[in-house]
Protein backbone atom coordinates (compact mmCIF):
# COMPACT_ATOMS: atom_id res chain seq x y z
CA UNK A 1 0.00 0.00 0.00
CA UNK A 2 1.21 3.51 -0.77
CA UNK A 3 0.75 5.55 2.38
CA UNK A 4 -0.82 8.90 1.55
CA UNK A 5 -1.50 7.97 -2.08
CA UNK A 6 -4.33 6.17 -3.86
CA UNK A 7 -4.66 5.03 -7.44
CA UNK A 8 -7.29 6.63 -9.68
CA UNK A 9 -8.41 4.89 -12.83
CA UNK A 10 -10.68 5.64 -15.74
CA UNK A 11 -11.81 3.06 -18.22
CA UNK A 12 -14.14 3.77 -21.09
CA UNK A 13 -15.95 1.60 -23.57
CA UNK A 14 -17.85 2.58 -26.71
CA UNK A 15 -21.07 0.67 -27.29
CA UNK A 16 -21.58 -0.89 -30.71
CA UNK A 17 -25.26 0.08 -30.61
CA UNK A 18 -27.37 2.74 -28.90
CA UNK A 19 -27.95 2.50 -25.15
CA UNK A 20 -30.99 0.48 -24.25
CA UNK A 21 -30.52 -1.82 -27.23
CA UNK A 22 -31.57 -5.41 -26.47
CA UNK A 23 -28.09 -6.47 -27.61
CA UNK A 24 -26.60 -4.86 -24.48
CA UNK A 25 -29.28 -5.79 -21.99
CA UNK A 26 -27.03 -8.32 -20.21
CA UNK A 27 -24.28 -5.73 -19.74
CA UNK A 28 -26.64 -3.04 -18.47
CA UNK A 29 -28.39 -5.52 -16.17
CA UNK A 30 -25.07 -6.51 -14.58
CA UNK A 31 -23.88 -2.96 -13.80
CA UNK A 32 -25.56 -2.61 -10.40
CA UNK A 33 -24.18 -5.94 -9.19
CA UNK A 34 -20.65 -5.26 -10.46
CA UNK A 35 -20.66 -1.76 -8.94
CA UNK A 36 -21.86 -3.14 -5.59
CA UNK A 37 -19.13 -5.79 -5.66
CA UNK A 38 -16.52 -3.13 -6.42
CA UNK A 39 -17.71 -0.94 -3.55
CA UNK A 40 -17.46 -3.91 -1.16
CA UNK A 41 -14.04 -5.00 -2.43
CA UNK A 42 -10.91 -4.59 -0.30
CA UNK A 43 -9.16 -1.34 -1.11
CA UNK A 44 -12.08 0.38 -2.81
CA UNK A 45 -12.14 4.10 -1.94
CA UNK A 46 -14.52 5.94 -4.31
CA UNK A 47 -16.38 5.77 -7.59
CA UNK A 48 -18.05 8.38 -9.74
CA UNK A 49 -21.81 8.06 -9.48
CA UNK A 50 -24.25 10.11 -11.44
CA UNK A 51 -26.10 10.84 -14.57
CA UNK A 52 -25.39 13.17 -17.46
CA UNK A 53 -21.76 14.09 -17.89
CA UNK A 54 -20.88 12.14 -14.73
CA UNK A 55 -21.75 8.80 -16.27
CA UNK A 56 -21.90 9.19 -20.02
CA UNK A 57 -19.63 10.38 -22.79
CA UNK A 58 -20.72 14.03 -23.01
CA UNK A 59 -17.34 15.27 -21.71
CA UNK A 60 -15.81 13.10 -24.43
CA UNK A 61 -18.26 14.19 -27.13
CA UNK A 62 -19.50 10.62 -27.62
CA UNK A 63 -22.89 9.53 -26.32
CA UNK A 64 -22.09 5.85 -26.89
CA UNK A 65 -19.34 5.82 -24.26
CA UNK A 66 -19.76 4.29 -20.86
CA UNK A 67 -17.32 5.55 -18.25
CA UNK A 68 -15.98 4.04 -15.06
CA UNK A 69 -13.95 6.34 -12.80
CA UNK A 70 -12.78 4.94 -9.46
CA UNK A 71 -10.15 5.38 -6.77
CA UNK A 72 -8.49 2.45 -4.96
CA UNK A 73 -6.03 2.25 -2.10
CA UNK A 74 -3.46 0.43 -4.27
CA UNK A 75 -2.85 -0.92 -7.74
CA UNK A 76 -2.93 -4.42 -6.25
CA UNK A 77 -6.43 -3.82 -4.83
CA UNK A 78 -7.67 -2.55 -8.19
CA UNK A 79 -6.06 -5.47 -10.04
CA UNK A 80 -7.54 -7.99 -7.61
CA UNK A 81 -11.03 -6.74 -8.36
CA UNK A 82 -10.53 -6.25 -12.10
CA UNK A 83 -8.87 -9.59 -12.78
CA UNK A 84 -9.89 -11.94 -9.96
CA UNK A 85 -13.50 -11.08 -9.20
CA UNK A 86 -15.46 -13.76 -11.06
CA UNK A 87 -18.52 -11.62 -11.78
CA UNK A 88 -16.39 -8.81 -13.20
CA UNK A 89 -14.34 -11.28 -15.24
CA UNK A 90 -17.49 -12.85 -16.70
CA UNK A 91 -18.62 -9.44 -17.94
CA UNK A 92 -15.16 -8.63 -19.31
CA UNK A 93 -15.08 -11.88 -21.29
CA UNK A 94 -18.13 -10.64 -23.21
CA UNK A 95 -16.89 -7.09 -23.87
CA UNK A 96 -16.35 -7.66 -27.61
CA UNK A 97 -20.08 -8.40 -27.96
CA UNK A 98 -20.98 -4.94 -26.67
CA UNK A 99 -18.06 -2.63 -27.37
CA UNK A 100 -15.85 -1.54 -30.25
CA UNK A 101 -12.09 -1.54 -29.80
CA UNK A 102 -10.61 1.80 -28.75
CA UNK A 103 -6.97 2.89 -29.09
CA UNK A 104 -6.90 3.94 -25.43
CA UNK A 105 -9.52 2.79 -22.94
CA UNK A 106 -7.70 2.78 -19.57
CA UNK A 107 -5.55 5.24 -17.66
CA UNK A 108 -4.34 5.14 -14.07
CA UNK A 109 -2.61 7.84 -12.02
CA UNK A 110 -1.75 8.62 -8.42
CA UNK A 111 -3.91 10.93 -6.32
CA UNK A 112 -3.56 12.02 -2.72
CA UNK A 113 -5.54 9.81 -0.34
CA UNK A 114 -9.03 11.28 0.00
CA UNK A 115 -8.92 13.13 -3.33
CA UNK A 116 -11.57 12.49 -5.96
CA UNK A 117 -10.63 13.10 -9.60
CA UNK A 118 -12.86 15.03 -11.96
CA UNK A 119 -14.09 13.59 -15.21
CA UNK A 120 -12.24 16.37 -17.05
CA UNK A 121 -8.97 15.37 -15.34
CA UNK A 122 -9.64 11.72 -16.12
CA UNK A 123 -10.23 12.55 -19.79
CA UNK A 124 -6.94 14.46 -19.88
CA UNK A 125 -5.15 11.39 -18.45
CA UNK A 126 -6.74 9.11 -21.03
CA UNK A 127 -5.80 11.55 -23.82
CA UNK A 128 -2.24 11.65 -22.46
CA UNK A 129 -1.80 7.88 -22.49
CA UNK A 130 -3.30 7.74 -26.00
CA UNK A 131 -0.83 10.36 -27.21
CA UNK A 132 2.37 9.40 -25.37
CA UNK A 133 1.85 5.90 -24.03
CA UNK A 134 2.41 5.16 -20.34
CA UNK A 135 4.07 7.94 -18.33
CA UNK A 136 4.19 8.80 -14.64
CA UNK A 137 1.12 11.01 -15.23
CA UNK A 138 -0.98 8.30 -16.95
CA UNK A 139 -0.17 4.60 -17.07
CA UNK A 140 -1.71 1.14 -17.20
CA UNK A 141 -1.40 -2.24 -15.48
CA UNK A 142 1.44 -3.37 -17.76
CA UNK A 143 3.54 -0.27 -17.12
CA UNK A 144 2.83 1.03 -13.61
CA UNK A 145 4.75 3.94 -12.12
CA UNK A 146 5.49 4.46 -8.42
CA UNK A 147 3.65 7.15 -6.50
CA UNK A 148 5.33 10.58 -6.41
Segments (PLM) and residue ranges:
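Short S/T/G/P-rich N-terminal loop/turn motif that feeds into the first structured element of a domain
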Residues: 1-65, 77, 104-148
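Tryptophan-centric aromatic hotspots in well-structured domains and transmembrane helices
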Residues: 46, 71-72, 98-99
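Short cationic amphipathic helices and targeting signals
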Residues: 66-70
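An amphipathic, aromatic/His-enriched active-site/gating alpha helix that lines ligand/cofactor pockets
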Residues: 75-103
